[in-house]
Amino acid sequence: MYSFQFENIVSLNDKSVLNNGCYLCVWHAHKIPPHIGLIIDGEYFSLKVKGKDTSIPLAEILKLIHRKEICTLLIEIKISVTRAQIITAFSQFSNAEAYRYSCLTPIADVFDLKQDVSMLADLLNSFKSKDQMGNVFGLNLISDFKGIPMYGIEEIEARLKALSKTL
């Protein structure tokens, strides 16, 4: 069962397309819950329990995904957003924390959807309903991958709590 199912996922043959525009990066897309970050013009941003990634060069992210064979989606977001907007949104948070902030929080802020989304499927459904989702690229996907697995807020909070115990 999926919380969001993709119609068409294509291979990323030309990584240079990620150097322009905005992409939602879904790490461990087959797991519950997945982790998300944002790519803007070839730079990566993400909020994690251990802190945050800001302005990480895309080449480093792709190298990690390839080396660890991480099941990843890169979803083109057809909304005009600037690097400055993303930096401002991420500057408000130091790290993800159970019952307060998740990796979704600053991303929802960037797109002014904080009140409307509480999980990745909500964000994806919002983009899809407004025709703001472009190409969906897949890297290291499992053979039968079709979409984001069904999960709830409880799984997100449990994962954040488990990760915070490893600090």
Model-identified regions with their sequence ranges:
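Catalytic-site beta-strand/loop segments enriched in glycine and acidic/polar residues
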Residues: 18-21, 84-90
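Low-complexity, intrinsically disordered/propeptide-like segments
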Residues: 61, 65, 77-78, 163
